[in-house]
Amino acid sequence: MDPCKFRPSSSFDTKTTTTNAGQPVWNDNEALTVGPRGPILLEDYHLLEKIAHFARERIPERVVHARGASAKGFFECTHDVTGLTCADFLRAPGARTPVIVRFSTVIHERGSPETIRDPRGFAVKFYTREGNWDLLGNNFPVFFIRDGIKFPDVIHAFKPNPKSHVQEYWRVFDFLSHHPESLHTFFFLFDDVGIPTDYRHMDGFGVNTYTFVSRAGKSHYVKFHWRPTCGVSCLMDDEATLVGGKNHSHATQDLYDSIDAGNFPEWKLFVQVIDPDEEDRFDFDPLDDTKTWPEDLVPLQPVGRLVLDRNVDNFFNENEQLAFGPGLVVPGIYYSDDKMLQCRVFAYADTQRYRLGPNYLMLPVNAPKCGFKNNHYDGAMNFMHRDEEVDYYPSRHAPLRHAEPASFPVPTRPVVGKREKTRIKKENDFVQPGERYRSWAPDRQDRFVRRFSDALAHPKVSHELRVIWIDFLSKCDKSCGMKVANRLNVKPSM
């Protein structure tokens, strides 16, 4: 029997019900009992299998980004970037690559409203000819912290109180009062862009700094930007309350219905690049994910377009079992020493192994569409057909060999230093948030002040914490801090 032809698929559905092993089920309406009113018999294998499977339908939800929706489509390279990267899928304008994209909220559980003031995830899996590349980002270009060792803490602070299971902002302000670098993200979260109208009308950002590597081995730091062709649209607070009260899944439904109607969402991909030899000319660290790269200093360069033209065939298979990881890169794209990215490379793969199992990359939605070969054998739920006799390397009995080093160039800059746990030198946490605030119209500034003040007004936010945050805001913009202080009737310390 062909081991691949009859692998489980709805393509081979029978006309009558069966067990998972294929035995006919002659009655799926009544359990097997002793007489019409007698006890149920344990020999009713179909009943036991049905109940046991039902009890195990749910898998652990993602610790973050649990609430999400996916769609499929393609990425098309539209501009020549071969001088920056040797990535095959960017080899020439017109080259197309199949993709699957997952949008999500961040903090709350699966099934929570999609109108919550919360960052949105924007993750893209490129099925390239040289393996899968996962670009994971958010709709904000910055993050709350810059060092991955604090990632569990910041998520714990935003998650519901472990005692009451209620999300409370006093916990957020308490923790992040030790991390003023979080201010920049707050100037997005409490801004008008804090609640996207839907997934089609929001930006996407890679957030972390990656590295482009050219065929010649030249490296450039790179940041990725997605811009929707239909423009950015967001909900005001009262609109979000109204929309969320009617439909908790409005963004998921909008994405599905739009694609179903032939109104395909599209984004343009842009990059910013910095020569590592010139990084010292900036007043911030280019590897700090709490900072943006000013577009007047580092202009956007067009790369391609992303089009979503197909809905998923099955939500569980292609959304819940869909697994992303920043560690999945392809030749021409590499990591940087961004501290958050370095931690994410391990963390995401590890959480997928917990959530889906050690062979999660064998699941059809996660498997590459190109050929692949390694000696990773066995493990729970391994369903890959293999008939080799050699499962080690090297061997004189098997033709497996290493890829040529030139096929996967990596950055070659030397790294020299002593072992230490320390902060980066160029923190500069208040300049960019202040510049962003001053770029807004007065009414937009007022809405930000109101939202921030309302959050700080939580009864468990102490006077000390309010003074700290007003001091932070004042360092960004003196008038902003003063307005928040006046709303809270707090005298600022400066």
Swiss-Prot record:
It holds the Pfam family Catalase-rel. Transmembrane segments: none annotated. The keyword Hydrolase does not apply. GO terms for molecular function: catalase activity; heme binding; metal ion binding. GO terms for cellular component: glyoxysome; plasma membrane. Its cofactor is heme. One of its GO terms (biological process) is response to hormone. Its EC number is 1.11.1.6. It comes from the Eukaryota. Residues 1-29 are annotated as: Disordered. Its main location: other. It is found in: Peroxisome; Glyoxysome. Residues 8-22 have a biased composition (Polar residues). Heme binds at Y348. The keyword Metal-binding applies. Keywords: Glyoxysome, Heme, Hydrogen peroxide, Iron, Metal-binding, Oxidoreductase, Peroxidase, Peroxisome. The active site is at H65, N138. It catalyses: 2 H2O2 = O2 + 2 H2O. Occurs in almost all aerobically respiring organisms and serves to protect cells from the toxic effects of hydrogen peroxide. Belongs to the catalase family. Homotetramer. This is Catalase isozyme 2. It comes from Hordeum vulgare. The gene is CAT2.
